């Protein structure tokens, strides 16, 4: 990839990182190259922050089943990824301490609303995520488009749909590139809405905050340059601007410079 920082939405749940076992298969049909891969991975991140924000908190992905297919035909590349995570454990209160009053008040609520609170604070959820991509590269000019969809069980996480399109031009050892993308998040549970409608004064602030945190309708631009001064080392510089229609406080401009090593 040309970027220093990957597009946030499409890569907020990794497809290929973690500890585990895997199997790969490669075959050819004329000019078509087909690569298939299956991984059984587990992963723990101590300071995970969702794309919608929050404090760093521990997240653990247990026994993730990941299947990938990648195909190359002359100058074209296309494929897809499927991931099923039977159990994702997340420290919801660690990431959102403002929700602690919800837990304290739960015992005094009617059973239905109490279940809604526990649904929001559920820290063990099932996840299904997939993406598809297609690219073209003639060695000088390249383009790539990718779409991803992440679906969480009933929890405080947001279901997310993301896409981006990128293009670039290589000149000598330099690569110039630009990317445009959009991320759209919707609450995976409507429990927060039910609690808000119940007009529970003691919980209103926390619930309303969670509702807003789960929503995202953002778009971003990335412009960057890469300089390959060695076959295994590249200097990268990216400028990213993010605009959010639902929450202007998440809007940002980021300039990043770094070295990319390939071992």
What are these regions (language model features)?
Residues 38-159:
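Surface-exposed beta-loop-beta
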Residues 30-36, 75-79, 140-145, 173-178, ...:
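Repeated loop/turn-to-beta-strand initiation elements of outer-membrane beta-barrel proteins
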Residues 25-27, 70-73, 135-138, 169-171, ...:
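Residue-level signature of outer-membrane beta-barrel architecture
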Residues 251-263:
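Outer-membrane beta-barrel "beta-signal"
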Residues 1-68, 199:
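Surface-exposed coil loops of outer-membrane beta-barrel proteins
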Residues 20-24, 64-68, 129-133, 164-166, ...:
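Membrane-embedded beta-strand positions in outer-membrane beta-barrel channels/transporters
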Residues 36-42, 80-84, 145-149, 169, ...:
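Transmembrane beta-barrel strands of outer-membrane/channel proteins
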Residues 175-232, 236-242:
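Outer membrane beta-barrel transmembrane domains
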């Amino acid at each position: 990839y040309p970027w220093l920082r990957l597009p946030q939405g499409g890569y907020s749940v990794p497809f290929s990182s973690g500890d585990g076992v895997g199997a790969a298969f490669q075959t050819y049909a004329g000019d078509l190259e087909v690569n298939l891969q299956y991984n059984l991975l587990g992963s723990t991140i101590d300071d995970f922050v969702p794309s919608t924000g929050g404090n760093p908190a521990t997240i653990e992905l247990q026994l993730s089943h990941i299947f990938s297919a990648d195909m190359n035909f002359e100058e074209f590349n296309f494929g897809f990824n499927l991931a099923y995570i039977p159990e994702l454990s997340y420290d919801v209160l660690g990431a959102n301490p403002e929700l602690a009053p919800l837990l304290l008040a739960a015992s005094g609520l009617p059973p239905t609303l109490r279940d809604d609170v526990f649904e929001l604070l559920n820290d063990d959820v099932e996840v299904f995520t997939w993406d598809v991509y297609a690219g073209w590269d003639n060695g000088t000019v390249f383009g790539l488009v990718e779409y991803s969809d992440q679906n969480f069980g009933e929890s405080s996480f947001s279901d997310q749909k993301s896409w981006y399109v990128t293009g670039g031009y290589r000149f000598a050892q330099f690569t110039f590139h630009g990317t445009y993308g959009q991320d759209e998040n919707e609450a995976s549970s409507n429990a927060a809405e039910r609690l808000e409608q119940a007009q529970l004064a003691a919980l209103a602030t926390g619930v309303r905050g969670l509702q807003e945190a789960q929503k995202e309708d953002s778009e971003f631009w990335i412009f960057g340059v890469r300089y390959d001064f060695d076959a295994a080392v590249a200097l990268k510089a990216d400028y990213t601007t993010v605009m959010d229609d639902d929450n202007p406080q998440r809007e940002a401009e980021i300039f990043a410079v770094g070295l990319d090593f390939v071992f």
